[in-house]
Swiss-Prot record:
Protein name as catalogued: Protein YOP1
This protein's GO CC annotations: cell division site; cortical endoplasmic reticulum; endoplasmic reticulum membrane; Golgi membrane; nuclear envelope
Pfam families: TB2_DP1_HVA22
Keyword tags: Endoplasmic reticulum, Golgi apparatus, Membrane, Transmembrane, Transmembrane helix
Upper classification of the organism: Eukaryota, Fungi, Dikarya, Ascomycota, Saccharomycotina
Topology within the bilayer: Multi-pass membrane protein
InterPro entries, sorted: TB2_DP1_HVA22
GO molecular function: membrane bending activity
Protein's job: Required to generate and maintain the structure of the tubular endoplasmic reticulum network and the vacuole. Induces high curvature in membranes and causes membrane tubule formation. Involved in membrane/vesicle trafficking.
Localization (cell): Endoplasmic reticulum membrane; Golgi apparatus membrane
Domain commentary: The short lumenal loops between transmembrane domains 1 and 2 and between transmembrane domains 3 and 4 may impart a wedge-like configuration, thus deforming membranes.
């Protein structure tokens, strides 16, 4: 038991060291004699309790804020780095996030019966949004990509499908065949 307490204390000290970067937290720590790590954990705990209770539907808002703020911050950082790996992580995240929100919009009646849905959604969004877990890529490859390939016929190389291009071209050709000589459809090849 003593070993667990020591590990928790070490983790809290590491959190305090990381939070030294934020002047507002340092000032708050001076005003109230509580370590920054305890303030952060208290805020996070209160945040999750509000999501859990979902009073007045606030769980949905707080869940979406968690799904926007943390990955949004990392996305802005990723835009400033020269590599592509982090860009791919967050582009994938936003595709999964949007897919989840569209699904959620159309299934409110079903979600009403799922207890603590927004608590689970928040945990899921953090799982797919935090880079150390790689959850967005996993969900994308397992669910979103196969669904997109089936519904939109996206080819593995990532570009528009050849059959979709062919269908669009045949629609243009069919339209042009019905236009009298000398008139233009306004569509350029």
């Amino acid at each position: 038991m003593s070993q667990i307490i020591d590990q928790v204390q070490a983790a809290l000290q590491n959190i305090d060291k990381e939070l030294e970067k934020y002047p507002a937290l340092k000032e708050l720590e001076k005003q109230i004699p509580v370590p920054k790590s305890y303030i952060l954990l208290g805020f996070v705990g209160f945040y999750f309790i509000l999501i859990f209770l979902n009073i007045g539907g606030i769980g949905q808002l707080l869940s979406n804020i968690a799904g926007l703020v943390i990955p949004g911050y990392y996305s802005l950082l990723a835009l400033e780095t020269p590599g592509k790996a982090d860009d791919t992580q967050y582009l994938t995240y936003w595709v999964v996030f949007a897919t989840l929100n569209v699904f959620e919009f159309w299934s409110k009646a079903i979600l009403y019966w799922v207890p603590f849905y927004y608590l689970f959604k928040t945990a899921f969004l953090l799982y797919i949004g935090l880079p150390q877990y790689g959850g967005a890529e996993l969900v994308y490859k397992a669910i979103v990509k196969p669904l997109a390939q089936k519904l939109v016929n996206i080819q593995p190389h990532g570009g528009p499908s050849d059959s979709l291009k062919a269908q669009a071209q045949s629609a243009v050709d069919a339209a042009e065949s019905h236009v009298p000589q000398g008139h233009s459809t306004g569509v350029s090849h």
